[in-house]
Each structure stands twice: as C-alpha cells, then as structure tokens.
Amino acid sequence: MEDGHHSPDSTKESKSEEHSKMNGSKLKRDGASNAGNAATPNGSQTGISRPPSMSPDEHKAASESTATPSENVPTQKPSRKASQKNMKREPVLFNHLPDVREEACTHFQVIHDCLYGSKNMGASEHDALDCDCAEEWRGDMNHACGEDSDCINRATKMECVDGDCNCGSGCQNQRFQRKQYADVSVIKTEKKGFGLRANTDLQVNDFIFEYIGEVINEPTFRSRMVKYDKEGIKHFYFMSLTKSEFVDATKKGNLGRFCNHSCDPNCYVDKWVVGDKLRMGIFAGRAIKAGEELVFNYNVDRYGADPQPCYCGEPNCTGFIGGKTQTERATKLPPATIEALGIEDGDSWDTAVAATVKKPRKKKATEDDEEYINRFEPRGLDEEGVTKVMATLMQCKEKWIAVKLLGRLQNADDDHVRNRVVKMHGYQILKTTLNTFKEDTNVVLQILDILYQLPRITKNKITDSNIEAAVEPLTHSDHEDVASQSKRLLQEWSKLETAYRIPRKKLDPSAPVTTNSFEDDRRNVNHEEHPSRPVNPFENMVVPTGPRSNIPQRNMNYFNNQRPRKLPTNLPAGWFVTTDSTGKYYFYDKSGHTQWQRPTTPAVDVPKPSAKVEQNQKALQDIIDSLTKEPTPRHSANQTPKSNTPVPDNGKKEKWRSLPVEKQMKIYENTLFPHVKYVMDKFHRRLPKEDLKRFGREINKKLVASDYKNHRVDDPTTISSNQARKIKKFVKDFFDRAVVKHRENEQRAAQKAGPSSSGAPSPTNGGSAKSPLGRNGASNATVKTQQPDADGDIVLTDVEDEGENTPATSSSDRKRKRAEEQEVPAPASEAIPSPKRAKEDSTTEDSIPSPPPPPPPPTDTPLTEEERSMREQEEALMRENEEAQRLEDEEAERRVSVTVQGAAVATSKVNGVNGTKAHHTSEASPAVSDENGMDAGRDEKSHEQMAQQEPVSR
C-alpha cells in the first residue's frame, strides 16, 4: 500500500473500510472513502468515459519509469464478447526496484502481534474443533494437515492448536501461530507509493502476511477517521474484522499494510480462527512469480464521493478506485462467499458480472447485495461444495447469507453430501449458527430441519458438539413448530448409543524407524486396479458393534457428558505430562523433576546400574533394614543359627510402596490367603462349602484389617514363619468355633423337626450322625491338633467325626505332613497374586511413572523493555476505546433527549393556550421547536454526512 511520499495524483487516493456487507474490507481514503477487501470480480466498463491515468506531461522514458505498461496509455474498453483469457497479460516484474524496507518502516511502528482494545475483542466465538488427521512425521517435521490434505480444520479456515487435535504438535496448519510469512521486499512505485514484491515463487493459497494493527471498536474507528483527517494523514489503513471491530494499521502494524490495490489481483484477504481469536491474513490467489507485486482488490465503495484514479494498469481496470464506476459492477461479496452461495465459481464470476452489467439486469445504485444475488439461481450442492458452504457458514454474520447457505444444505438429498456435512464439523457449526440467529424463527426451523436430515449412527459427534444444550431451550419456545421439532430431534438423539472408539496410536518422532515390508507392500497397492468392486456406503463410517466381553464398554464422554481434555503429545524422550488440581499442565521426568514449561530437549536419564550391582545394593539395604527394625534374635544352644545371607531380589520388591493403601491391603490379603486356605482345607468335610468360603473371606479380611490397624505390616508381599504359625492357629480356632456353632444349629433344627425324624441322619451333617461320639471325637481331634511338633508349629490332621475309629496317624505320616507344611511356599516378593493386575501394574510402572506433585507456581518473569512498552500501549488503547464508547453513548442519549424535547414542544403548540400571555408563549414555542428541530435535523444530517465520509454502511 501507499505510504510516505507520493505524487500529487496519488495523494488523492485513500484507504478506508466498508462496515457490514464486506468480509474484511480495506481502503485507502482521502476525505471520505469506503473500501472492501473482498476480491470482487471486475467486469468491463460501460456507460462511463474513463479519463487517462496520467496527464501528458507525466510521461517518462521507459528506462526511468516504474509504472506499469498500461499506465501511459488509456485502457481500451473491452468487447462484450471478449474472452477473459484474452484480457490477461504477462505479469510485470519489479526486480529492478531496490528494497526500501528500512525507509518504509520509518512511517509507522512495527509490531508483531495485534493490540486489542479489550480482552473480548477479536473473539472467534467458536469452540475448539478437532481434525481427523494423523501424525505424519518425516524426519523432524510433522507433515500432517498440509495444503493437499483433507484436513477439516484447514478446509473450514481454522488453525490446529497443539494438544487439542489428533494431528500432533507442529502440524502444517499453524501458519499464523508460527508467523510463516512469505519472503517479500518493500518497493517504492512511481504513482502507488510503497508496495510489496515477492522474492520467491508462490503457489495458490500460500500464506503471505497477517494483517496486524490495533483492534478497535466502532466509536474509536469513527473518532480516528476524524482525527487522522485533521492531522493531514491522507492514507488510512483500516480492515473490518467483524461488524463492530476494525484493525487499524495506520500508525502500528507490519509489512502487510503495504499491499496495494489492483482490479486484477493476485492475492486475497481471508479470516481464520486461531485459538480463541479471529485473525486476518493475506494469501496468494494464484501462482505468483518472483518479482511480481503483491496486490488485492480493495473494492472501494465511496457512497457518492468522487472516485480516485486507479493506477493498476490491468486490462480490465475500471480506471477508478471507488465511486459508481466500480461498485455498480458487482456485489462486494468475496469470491469464497459467492462460490458458497452457488451462484458462480470464482473464475466465471467476472464474466457473468460483465455480461450482466450490459443487460437490463445490471445492479442498480439503490440495490443491495441481497436483491442482486436473488436474481441468480444457485447450483446444486455436491461434496466439494459442502466444504465451501460450511467454511462460509462458520463465519457468517449476515442473516440473508446464512439463510441461503442453510437453504442449500436443506435442499441436498444426497446421502454422501449429508455425510460430508457431518464430517465438516456440521454439528458444531450448526450449533454456532443456531446461537447466532436464535431470535429468528425461520432460521431456527431451517437448522432444526437440517439436523433432522443428517445421518444418525452413533451419538459421539452430537455429544462432542454439545448441541443438545442449544436445542433444549427451544422445546419451551412459544412457537409451536419450533417446540415440536426440537422435541422430535431430542427424542431421536436419545435413542442413539455412544460408540467406543479406539484412540489413535501416538507416533514418537524420536523413536527409531522400523521397516515393515508387509506394510510397505500394502501401502503401495494401487486400489484403482479393482474398479469392479462395489462401493461400500459404510466404508467411511464406524458401525457400532456389541461389546467384546461382559464388561460394558463406554466412551470417555460417558461420564459428566464432557469431552476430556487431551494432554500434549510428542514430548521429548523421558518426559511425561499430567495435570494439577486446577487442570493446568505440568511436565515431569522419571527422576521426579517437574516444570511448567514444555520441555524441548530429552530428559537426562540416570544410567541404570547392572543387575549384579543392583542386587548387592538391595541386599545391603535389607541387612540395614533388618538391623534397624527388629532386635537381634537370641539363639539357644540347641538351635542352629539361620544364615544371614539375604535372598537375591530382582529389584521389583519395593514397587508396592508407590501404591495406595487400598492396593497394599489387597496385596497383603493375597499374601495371607495361602495360609488361611491351608487350614480351610482341613474343614472341607465338617462345614458346608458355601459357609467355608464365606468364613475364609471374612477371617482373611479381618486379619488384614487388624494388622494394618495395629501397624504390624512392614511388607505386604511376605510374612515371617512366626506370623504364619500365629495365623494358622488363629484361623483354626476360628473354624473350630464355627464347627461347634454349626452342630448346635443342626441339633436345634432336628429337635424342631419332631421325634419321628430325630433318629434320621441330617442331610447337611456330612455324616456326623453316624457316630454317637461325634462331639467327643471333635473335641479329641481338637486336642490332638493343638499339640506342637518339635519345631513348635501346629500340626493339623484330617481327623473327622467318622474318622475316630481309624487308627492313629503313624509317625512317618506326621513327618510327611510336617515336611509338606514347611514346604508351603510363601508368596514371592515380586509376584502379585492377581495376574491381570500384575500385568497392568508392570506395564504402567515401566512406561509412565507415577506423577510427582506439581511444581511451585511459576514466578512472574520480568518483562523486557519491548514487552513492557507493548503492554502500556495496549492499556492506552483500552482506555481510548472506553472513552470513545462513553462519548458515543452520551451523544446518543443527548439526541434522544433533544428529540423528546422537540416532540413535547410540538405537542404544546398543537394544543394551544388562550390569552395574550399564552399566545406569546405559543408563538415563542414554535421558534424553540423549530430551533430544536433544526438542531436535531442538523445533528441527523451531520450524522449522515459522517456516515458518508466514513467507510461504514448504515
């Protein structure tokens, strides 16, 4: 764009901005001019004689002039039937001009990010959406979400954010965030002032620059227009971000402000959603050669003001920027919106408009865009058109455009088109549109009808978009159709089930590349070799199936009906991520080091000692623990001292310490159970099976609770022989009492049955009624089993009631039983009884260690001088916005007060008052009324003049 020193003719140009009908308009203004950034097509000129762009005395030698070839000769009016291709010419290269970036940057302050007049300015009003792309690492670069990919976010003009998408960190759809600007130079032209030149070849849709400046509200925009005019600033750099928000790069911005106007542009301006902000960028509209000037169409509308000369020199140049010469030719809608409406594609729109201008159907001066577009019949919607419709609908704020876009979706009856709508974030975008136009019943009915037509297989996308929360209030609407359709839709959604989706495998870019010839062969297969294969309509859909086990499988969204927040992926080797109680991310490594900042280098991994060294260290630690925790046992003379040599361990013994108490108690319960079961087996014929199992579980849990309560457990994975002996004695006493109680209950039951059945044996007695000495036998058996052996252990026998008649157990049998008891293996220290839990714990422990506590809150790092200056400037901008808004509110209140006062005076004049005094008063009243009315009229007229002078469409 022009800046700095200009020729006399060029100083008449100006840049300004159109308010509501344009998608990011921009203009260069002198006095009162309105402009739009939308690259509207440029038809041929009719009915207006075009003055030459240069006066005769302004001609220069070809070697000295930097003007384009057509600047010296007036452009001839193209023929109606002339082809658009015939009007094209070879692009002009400006490689001979020097780079004057340093000089150009002296006319404004260079800033790297937009300054916002308030925290809520520039808000995108869109929820974060996930793309379905997979990570694609080649070397150190993630090639996912590229230009040729089918990335949903890229198609809908949204950038991916690390941690929120499946594509991994550092994908190709982060151009705004990384400031991946094109290589350009600033040149100084003869008539257009400063401009941008491409230093390298650019492809279609390449990102050139973000348009950066101060984001201000409408009152500040109006006041700055007046202020700049008084200061003598001839070139304003305003861009419309939303209906009431503007980007002002007049005094603060970047090199994007130097992009000039052309009637045949090679660039276009578009808005993208980046995180929670709406940002504006300049993109290549076609293939651009190195040395070309970067230009886009301002599409200025001057609202009756004198048009400014256009020096672009293109064959289709209208000769002017602004005025009726340009603005009556077509709508100010951008090409993307025109294509989304299904009127014409971007290439044929210029031709269609040129033909339309010469026919009676040309756009009238009083005709708006809606009336003009209504003359054209939209095309049918196909799968490719869905992408354009959804991208435009996501940022649409004009109701009439939204109605037409929704109408195209509503009339689509192809299942492939509807599936494409769902894939392109259909539920999220329709929810946003519903919230934007929820006051309009017709728009709401359109959206409800589209939602009902969309294919419904699972509830995943419906739940993820949270669209049910937007539809629920409509069930209580006063409009009968809205309420009924909302209830019908919610009822259909309630019948759907949430399908379980296997999460994608996260690729580690630092992992070594493994070759798999089988997978390579599969990837190289040409799928087009089988044209006869029928097309599966469910190929791209996940059809829900039944659960694979009795355990119900549920989606992560089942709980709390919320989408879980995804943790950052692709961290450097050795680093892990988790969240604190407030949901903030922090990072840690295996050594327990924590930090808030995302790590950029692999963690320092302490070398693991060898197995032998580790065993020796463990053995030494066990000796120290045994000496500090237990007193040295005193051995009697007749006892052989036990060896103090520790049993080698594999290093996994102490992993139970990191487990919670509940898991430790479960491990200890499994450790005690073999000893409890050993005693239980001796009573399997003396107690019913179910009672025996129940008693075993109860006594086991009772022992665990008692030992933990009295702090008798040092290691839940093993117990000493002394503990085992006490446990067996306690369990045996418990079961002896249980047997006695069981027999007493049986006897009471037999007595209640009557004398006739008293002699019959009890079926549940297990044969105890066969011997009249059953009770005594049990007592004798108890006495026998409580006799300690030579080692002091309790020897349990299989003596039963009916076994009293059998001979006593021989001494060899007793020795064998003692040997078997001594050979009962204690649970291995490294083995956890549950194989499933052992597998899970080992996997978890080996892959991701338990997260340590979060680091202390980060200290506020001191701001640099530049950061402090930017913060002060942003605070000053906020105060300016607030002051401008306050003044406008006061002015609006004053106008309302004047209008009310004038109406009251006019009413008193009509009523009239008799008498001389009243007569004089009534004569004076009209004067006041007229004066007030003139003031009000003058205010309104002044307001209208301001609206004409400023690029705001009322």
From Swiss-Prot:
GO cellular component, one term: nucleus
Disordered, as annotated region: 1-90, 507-553, 629-654, 743-954
Polar residues biased stretches: 34-48, 63-77, 635-647, 777-788, 945-954
Biased composition (Basic and acidic residues): 1-31, 519-532, 865-896
Residue stretches making up the SET domain: 182-299
Signal peptide: none
UniProt biased composition (Pro residues): 849-860
Sorted UniProt keywords: Chromosome, Coiled coil, Methyltransferase, Nucleus, Repressor, S-adenosyl-L-methionine, Transcription, Transcription regulation, Transferase
Residues annotated as domain Post-SET: 306-322
Gene: set-2
Enzyme superclass (EC): transferase
Protein's name according to its UniProt entry: Histone-lysine N-methyltransferase, H3 lysine-36 specific
Record's keyword annotation contains S-adenosyl-L-methionine: yes
Location of the AWS domain: 126-180
Catalytic activity: L-lysyl(36)-[histone H3] + 3 S-adenosyl-L-methionine = N(6),N(6),N(6)-trimethyl-L-lysyl(36)-[histone H3] + 3 S-adenosyl-L-homocysteine + 3 H(+)
Domain notes: The AWS and SET domains are necessary for transcription repression.
